From Swiss-Prot:
PROSITE patterns: KINESIN_MOTOR_1 (PS00411), KINESIN_MOTOR_2 (PS50067). It is linked to Intellectual developmental disorder, X-linked 100: A disorder characterized by significantly below average general intellectual functioning associated with impairments in adaptive behavior and manifested during the developmental period. Intellectual deficiency is the only primary symptom of non-syndromic X-linked forms, while syndromic forms present with associated physical, neurological and/or psychiatric manifestations. XLID100 clinical features include intellectual disability, epilepsy, microcephaly and cortical malformations. Taurodontism, microdontia, and dens invaginatus: An X-linked recessive disorder characterized by the triad of taurodontism, microdontia, and dens invaginatus. Taurodontism is a rare developmental dental condition that largely affects the molar teeth and may be associated with hypodontia. In taurodontism, the crown of the molar tooth and pulp chamber are disproportionately longer than the roots. Microdontia, a mild form of hypodontia, is defined as smaller than normal teeth with shortened crowns (vertically or mesio-distally) and loss of contact areas between the teeth. It comes from the Eukaryota. Its main location: nucleus. PANTHER family: CHROMOSOME-ASSOCIATED KINESIN KIF4A-RELATED (PTHR47969:SF15). ATP binds at G88, Q89, T90, G91, S92, G93, K94, T95. Its cofactor is [2Fe-2S] cluster; [4Fe-4S] cluster. Disulfide bonds: none annotated. Highly expressed in hematopoietic tissues, fetal liver, spleen, thymus and adult thymus and bone marrow. Lower levels are found in heart, testis, kidney, colon and lung. This is Chromosome-associated kinesin KIF4A. Interacts with the cytosolic iron-sulfur protein assembly (CIA) complex components CIAO2B and MMS19; the interactions facilitate the transfer of Fe-S clusters to KIF4A to ensure proper localization of KIF4A to mitotic machinery components. Interacts (via C-terminus) with unphosphorylated PRC1 (via N-terminus); the interaction is required for the progression of mitosis. Keywords: ATP-binding, Chromosome, Coiled coil, Cytoplasm, Cytoskeleton, DNA-binding, Intellectual disability, Iron, Iron-sulfur, Isopeptide bond, Metal-binding, Microtubule, Motor protein, Nucleotide-binding, Nucleus, Phosphoprotein, Ubl conjugation. Residues 1132-1142 have a biased composition (Basic and acidic residues).
């Protein structure tokens, strides 16, 4: 009852969940550590919190329930209300701990939460209490967006639920569905129905996040079957709160954001209630009505309930701030004091109250009339009452005397009993020592005999030392007995002193009487205990004596038993022999007399065996009796020890009671003395006041005379007061400057600390995001390593050997391992930085800092100075913000202008790029025509092979003319290369301008790899725009077979031997030159693209045949001499084989790369055929004399090759870049 009046604190259990896979993938670390064997948790390195229960991540659900929740259920059956409350941030495991997502399929799983286990335990206890009748009702509600919804009602729209407050029953919910349940299965089905109706949604932090507060209530009413009027009512509230959340982490939008705002609002009101109840200094208003959640939990927090708060936290360091807030709220909740009472039925309580009132009135009536008077007495009531009062007074006085005597007798009895006990203990010790000394004396005699026999000097010395020690022991035992006797005498003297103290007043008589009765009762118990102890000890003594006397008999019986057993064995053997002899004698008729004797002997032996067995059984019974006696003796000794301990405790209790009574008596005596002294002082003060009154009456006359003088002095004092006030104002104005400086410095420091704290939080969030990205990269690399995939290298299309592929795979695995190690090292470094920052924030943000912050402002003057300084800082910050905003607007406008310019330049770049692409297409077409021309010349050389056989001189002239044509073509190709180089320089200039524009706009509108990569397929930068474009023609050059073969083989080798790393070098090495543009008038021959059949052909217009300098196709041209003869044949072959078709450069064929250009470079097969033809021609050339000297011809050819060698590099580059979009490398294909 005393605890209920004082209040019972709210019990807090801390539960920490393990790290979830998402936190592990983000690289989060544990920020909580647990003290083994203690309910204590440490945040960081030195900030610790202590609670009633602490459960680490490895704790199972069953242990949490049995340790923290199960004790509350016992109080529910005693009539007390109980509440289990789960509190914490979102995703911390509240619904898991409470079992808010329970279904019937999880019945026997170890992950079942608190609510299903509570239901099972309730019905188990109900089954045990067979003498009570129980009625159970359940209700289930949720608070969603500050609206109460009934989860057990099938149609939520119809239910209108309101909260009402009853002065007798407390908070009531009107309109809430309550279902009566009889078995546990019905209750579980109600729970499952409510869980299915509960509002749940997914957020970025939790896939199954509770969006409402849920309260499952079980109402229990119990009545005794024997007494229907006595009944108890209790309620058990099981609360699963929604978790506090941050929009930054949950990324909630729309309805989820609105739900999160309402959840945080309700939890804020709950936190305010916890803070108000947990602060002992405030003791003021508690804001229960701020939200519906706190209104419903009014009895659970600071009211009529046993409450347990399960604080659920996350151990991840990314949630440190939310975890710390939860720990602080839980620590405050431990300071809340509840006042639970037994909830009795109002009718039963009223009935019991009336019964007590009737009893009190009956007692008062008896006291007034002196008991029930018979009707025959005719004496007046007043005289009878007077005599009864006198008699009562005399009886009271006699009772007081008897109580004093009883207390004195009890004290003396206690003292005597204490002496007896001490003497008994001393006697027992002495007997034990006597026994030891006897044993020592026997040992001493043995040792002396041994010494005499062995004559060893060392043993004699040891024996002397033992004798000295025995004497010392006896002396010490005598001293201890003397000390005990002295202690007993001092105790007796103290009691005598106490008894000789002055008598107390009548007000202490009741306490004295109670003390005397207690002492008498304990003395009586002690006497009875001593009697029982004496009987037990006597019985034990007798039984031990009997045992000692029975011991030799026991030995004798054991010997007799052995002898009897031997005799029985011998007689048994003899009996068996006789039986055998009788069986043999039956066969022989002559031995009848002998068998008769043997039969009699057999009967005698059987009688002896029976007698011996009887004796054996009797002696074994005696031995068993001896063993039972020993057991009884040991049991008696144990009971004697227990009774002695009980006697000691009773004596100690009597002594403590006597000591308390003595202290109380001394205190009362001291109070009486103080009261007497106070009365004397009051009398003296009364006399003193009388004298003072006389003096004051004499002084009064004098004061009236001095009134005028006092009036004058008052005016002077007022004048002085005004002067002092003026001086005070001046000092205050002077002191205000010092106060302002002090307040300014203090506020500056506080603002700086708060700003640095916020910056540290921002850096902490950045570090957490960095670690999250690093963890994702590590996870991706590990997945690639486990699956055997390689990172996609940028390689050209080529054929790899098996060893190269294996080498690349091993190199890629090593690189992945190194990347993983470097990333893990970086993650460890980030984790160390995060832990350091979090520890600094914990040190900076102490719980008392907000309270201590305003303690420095104690006066209105300091508050004014602080307000003035803050207003000044606010104005200056506003001005600075406006300046920054104006500069930001200017930078935005300049950025917009830059973007506009960049957009225009990009459009211009696109136009120039399209023009260059068209120009390149034209150049490619011309190049293809030249290749076809060379192939036609090769065909012509094959046709002329027969003519070479006829005349060597004609063949030599034709070869020289071919060489000349090839030289001219080579010169033209060089001019084309120079033009290409010029275009590339212009490209580089425009590219630099574009880069400058991007830097000026501070935005990378084009990706860096698209603009600057040497491997890009779109590396064309347009030249400066010109006002007018003039169509130009490029010079044509011829190229001999050897040059084409060399260039083609070199390009093929480069494609086969080069990889992705050598692309940049190749692209940088080749720098095409700008083609030289010549006017139309310098071009010789026609520029037809068709058959040269009409007068649009320049050569036909001038009435001349097309020649080598013409751009027309020799196989199609009708204006050539050789083409006129075989026109029909050429036309047929042109349409089928030799015609040139310009392919669409944007057409993509499956399996080929994007922008696969027309293959203009001859492949190795064609070049090989060319070489074979040339070798045949050279072999078939006869060594006949001719107008041209062949050695000279060879000399000219070698000189030509030597002159041509410096230009091979450019030719090779030109041959490798003759594809579509010449001047840029082809698109690289990823290795799959």
């Amino acid at each position: 009852m005393k605890e209920e009046v004082k209040g019972i604190p709210v019990r807090v259990a801390l539960r920490c969940r393990p790290l979830v896979p998402k936190e592990i993938s983000e690289g989060c670390q544990m920020c909580l550590s647990f003290v083994p064997g203690e309910p204590q948790v440490v945040v960081g390195t030195d900030k610790s919190f202590t609670y009633d229960f602490v459960f680490d991540p490895s704790t199972e659900q069953e242990e949490v329930f049995n340790t923290a929740v199960a004790p509350l259920i016992k109080g529910v059956f005693k009539g007390y209300n109980a509440t289990v409350l789960a509190y914490g941030q979102t995703g911390s495991g509240k619904t898991y701990s409470m079992g808010g997502a329970y279904t019937a399929e999880q019945e026997n799983e170890p992950t079942v939460g608190v609510i299903p286990r509570v239901i099972q335990l309730l019905f188990k206890e109900i089954d045990k209490k067979s003498d009570f009748e129980f009625t159970l009702k359940v209700s289930y509600l949720e608070i969603y967006n500050e609206e109460i919804l009934d989860l057990l009602c099938p149609s939520r729209e119809k239910a209108q639920i309101n909260i009402r407050e009853d002065p007798k029953e407390g908070i009531k919910i009107v309109g809430l569905t309550e279902k009566t349940v009889l078995v546990a299965l019905d209750t579980v089905s109600c729970l499952e129905q409510g869980n299915n109706s509960r509002t749940v949604a997914s957020t970025a932090m939790n896939s199954q996040s509770s969006r409402s507060h849920a309260i499952f209530t079980i109402s229990l009413e119990q009545r005794k079957k024997s007494d229907k009027n006595s009944s108890f009512r209790s309620k058990l509230h099981l609360v699963d709160l929604a978790g506090s959340e941050r929009q930054k982490k949950t990324k909630a939008e729309g309805d989820r954001l609105k739900e999160g705002i309402n959840i945080n609002r309700g939890l804020l009101c709950l936190g305010n209630v916890i803070s108000a109840l947990g602060d002992d200094k405030k003791g003021g208003f508690v804001p229960y009505r701020d939200s519906k959640l706190t209104r419903l939990l009014q009895d659970s927090l600071g009211g009529n309930s046993h409450t347990l708060m399960i604080a659920c936290v996350s151990p991840a360091d990314s949630n440190l701030e939310e975890t710390l807030n939860t720990l602080r709220y839980a620590d405050r909740a431990r300071k809340i004091k509840n006042k639970p009472i037994v909830n009795i039925d109002p009718q039963t309580a009223e009935l019991n109250h009336l019964k007590q009132q009737v009893q009190q009135l009956q007692v008062l009536l008896l006291q007034a009339h002196g008991g029930t008077l018979p009707g025959s007495i005719t004496v007046e009531p007043s005289e009878n009452l007077q005599s009864l009062m006198e008699k009562n007074q005399s009886l009271v006085e006699e009772n007081e005397k008897l109580s004093r005597g009883l207390s004195e007798a009890a004290g003396q009895t206690a003292q005597m009993l204490e002496r007896i006990i001490l003497t008994e203990q001393a006697n027992e010790k002495m007997n034990a020592k006597l026994e030891e000394l006897r044993q020592h004396a026997a040992c001493k005699l043995d040792l002396q005999k041994l010494v005499e026999t062995l004559e060893d000097q060392e043993l004699k010395e040891n024996v002397e030392i033992i004798c000295n020690l025995q004497q010392l022991i006896t002396q010490l035992s005598d001293e201890t007995v003397a000390c005990m006797a002295a202690a007993i005498d001092t105790a007796v003297e103290q009691e005598a002193q106490v008894e000789t103290s002055p008598e107390t007043s009548r007000s202490s008589d009741a306490f004295t009487t109670q003390h005397a009765l207690r002492q008498a009762q304990m003395s009586k118990e002690l006497v009875e205990l001593n009697k029982a102890l004496a009987l037990k000890e006597a019985l034990a003594r007798k039984m031990t004596q009997n045992d000692s006397q029975l011991q030799p008999i026991q030995y004798q019986y054991q010997d007799n038993i052995k002898e009897l057993e031997l005799e029985v064995i011998n007689l048994q053997k003899e009996k068996e022999e006789l039986v055998l002899e009788l069986q043999t004698a039956k066969k022989d008729a002559n031995q009848a007399k002998l068998s008769e004797r043997r039969r009699k002997r057999l009967q005698e032996l059987e009688g002896q065996i029976a007698d011996l067995k009887k004796k054996l059984n009797e002696q074994s019974k005696l031995l068993k009796l001896k063993e039972s006696t020993e057991r009884t003796v040991s049991k008696l000794n144990q009971e004697i020890r227990m009774m002695k301990n009980q006697r000691v405790q009773l004596m100690r209790q009597m002594k403590e009671d006597a000591e308390k009574f003595r202290q109380w008596k001394q205190k009362k005596d001291k109070e009486v003395i103080q009261l007497k002294e106070r009365d004397r002082k009051r009398q003296y003060e009364l006399l003193k006041l009388e004298r003072n009154f006389q003096k004051q009456s004499n002084v009064l006359r004098r004061k009236t005379e001095e009134a005028a003088a006092a009036n004058k002095r008052l005016k002077d004092a007022l004048q002085k007061q005004r002067e002092v006030a003026d001086k005070r104002k001046e000092t205050q104005s002077r002191g205000m400057e010092g106060t302002a400086a002090r307040v300014k410095n203090w506020l500056g420091n506080e603002i700086e600390v708060m700003v640095s704290t916020e910056e540290a939080k921002r850096h902490l969030n950045d570090l957490l995001e960095d670690r999250k990205i690093l963890a994702q990269d590590v996870a991706q690399l590990k997945e690639k390593k486990e699956s055997g995939e390689n990172p996609p290298p940028k390689l050209r299309r080529r054929t790899f050997s098996l060893t190269e592929v294996r080498g690349q795979v091993s190199e890629s695995e090593d690189s992945i391992t190194k990347q993983i190690e470097s990333l893990e090292t970086e993650m460890e470094f980030r984790s160390a930085q995060i832990a350091d920052l979090q520890q600094k924030l914990l040190d900076a943000e102490s719980e008392d800092r907000p309270k201590q912050r305003w303690e420095n402002i104690a006066t209105i003057l300091e508050a004014k100075c602080a307000l003035k300084y803050l207003i000044g800082e606010l104005v200056s910050s506003k001005i600075q913000v406006s300046k920054l905003e104006s500069s930001l607007k200017q930078s935005k406008t300049s950025c917009a202008d830059m973007q506009k310019m960049l957009f225009e330049e990009r459009n211009h770049f696109a136009e120039i790029e399209t023009e260059l692409q068209a120009e390149l297409v034209r150049m490619e077409q011309q190049h293809q025509e030249k290749v076809l021309y060379l192939l036609s010349q090769l065909q012509q050389s094959q046709m002329a092979e027969k003519q070479l056989e006829e005349s060597v001189s004609e063949k030599e002239q034709q070869l020289l003319s071919t060489l000349k044509c090839q030289d001219e073509e080579l010169e033209k190709m060089r001019e084309v290369c120079e033009q290409n180089q010029q275009l590339l320089r212009e490209n580089e200039i425009i590219k630099q301008k574009l880069t400058l524009l991007q830097v000026a706009s501070r935005q990378k509108h084009l990706p860096k790899d698209t603009l600057l990569s040497p491997d890009s397929s779109f590396e064309y930068v347009p030249p400066k725009p010109k006002p007018s474009r003039v169509k130009e023609k490029f010079l044509e050059q011829s190229m001999d077979i050897e040059d084409l073969k060399y260039c083609s083989e070199h390009s093929v080798n480069e494609h086969e031997d080069g990889d992705g790393d050598d692309d940049e070098g190749d692209d940088e090495e080749w720098k095409p030159t700008k083609l030289v543009k010549v006017s139309r008038k310098n071009i010789q021959g026609c520029s037809c693209k068709g058959w040269c059949g009409n007068k649009q052909c320049g050569c036909r217009k001038q009435k001349s045949d097309c020649g080598v300098d013409c751009c027309c196709d020799p196989t199609k041209c009708r204006n050539r001499q050789q083409g006129k003869d075989s026109l029909g044949t050429v036309e047929r072959t042109q349409d089928s084989e030799g015609s040139f078709k310009l392919e669409d450069p944007t057409e993509v064929t499956p399996g080929l790369s994007f922008f696969n250009p027309v293959c203009a470079t001859p492949n190795s097969k064609i070049l090989k055929e060319m070489c074979d033809v040339e070798q045949v021609l050279s072999k078939k050339t006869p060594p006949a004399p001719s107008p041209f000297d062949l050695p000279e011809l060879k000399h000219v050819a070698t000189e030509y090759q030597e002159n041509k060698a410096p230009g091979k590099k450019k030719k090779r580059a030109l041959a490798s870049n003759t594809s579509f979009f010449s001047g840029c490398s082809p698109i690289e294909e990823e290795a799959h």
